[in-house]
Each structure stands twice: as structure tokens, then as C-alpha cells.
Amino acid sequence: EPVQGEAGVRELPAGYLEAARELTRTAGALLIVDEVQTGMGRSGAWMAHHLLAPGVVPDVVTLAKGLGGGIPIGAVVATGEAASLLGPGQHGTTFGGNPVACAAALAVIDTIRGQDLLGRVERLGSAWARELLAVDGVDEVRGRGLLIGVGLAAGLPPAGEIAATLAEHGFIVNAPRPDTIRLAPPFILSDDDASAFTTTLSEVLARALSEKAGS
């Protein structure tokens, strides 16, 4: 993954993908990039590796989640020699190429292009990250576009408890790590909704910090 979602929204170190490309080329192995969480515009580009390592061309890219816009679909995209490793009929799947899922994927691609959602995700993600970083109790904001990891300060309740409190206020987030809240909202998230979340997060963390100080 160019940005590791379950690890707390952490980017690969600079140069990592370039080194992986060189190692796999030397060994005659495939470089497979997992863009299931980060692909299809989530990072503000079609694929997160386009941002982190623009010169790297993977042999295989895996896609799902955002590709279908809510309709279940997964895809394996192969380039170059890797694309010829499987011939027709060598890999079967009962629902492979499902017409409804494929139509949904095409509609997603058309919508992202037609509504400039890549630009929208990049602009909103950058502005929102700055807002979140200014919240008392937030130590760090990581990620790209609208895949954001909010690193909580030491001494706060576990991120899972904070996420549960936010859910009570109408915001669905999750906590992949004990100190991290992960945000992955729809690309059509409004500026007002983003600001409303920031305000609520600030209130929730302020209450938690106050309770800690009084204990």
C-alpha cells in the first residue's frame, strides 16, 4: 500500500517504491501495488503511487472499494509482460465481469472526471488537514487527499472510545490504531460538513482533556 490504511494512515518512506521497483526488476519478480483503499481518487490522484513515486510503473495494481461507488467490485490491473501471464480461461470466477458492477465502475470513472473530483479531494483534504492539526489534543495529521489519519495526543482515551463518541454525534469514523482516528469520507463531502466534524472533534477532545485534568 502506498499509504497504509490499517497501520494508521502512514505513507511509505520516500524512495521506498523506487527501491522496490529496482529490487523486483533485478530479481525477476512482480511489483504489486495495493490501491484498494488509496486508489480511484481517494488520495487526490487516480492512484496514490502516482503522487508518492511518479516514475514507478507497477506490474500489477489491485483495486476495489471506491472503484464501484458502493457496488461490490474488485479488479487486478496488469501492465507489460505481467498482462500476458494469464490467458483467456486460465482464471475463472463465477461473477467476474458482472455487468452491473462494471457499469457502476464506468459511471464512477465518468463522475470523477466530469466533476473534477480529483481536484476537489486534493483541495478539501489539504485544507481540512490544516484545520484538524490546529485542534487541541491532535498531535499529527497524516495521509493524502481524503484518506486522513488524526494522531491523538498522549493521555487521551483510546481512539476507539473517541470514535464511539463521535458516532453518537453523527460522525462515522474508525480507529485503526489506539492513537489514530481514520477519516475516509465521500468525495462529495461539503466544506461545511468537514468544518462541523472538526468542531465536534475539538469539543470531544476538550471534554476528554478536561476530565483527565480533573481526575
Task: Report residues per predicted region.
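Conserved N-terminal phosphate-binding loop of PLP-dependent enzymes in the Aspartate aminotransferase
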Residues: 1-215
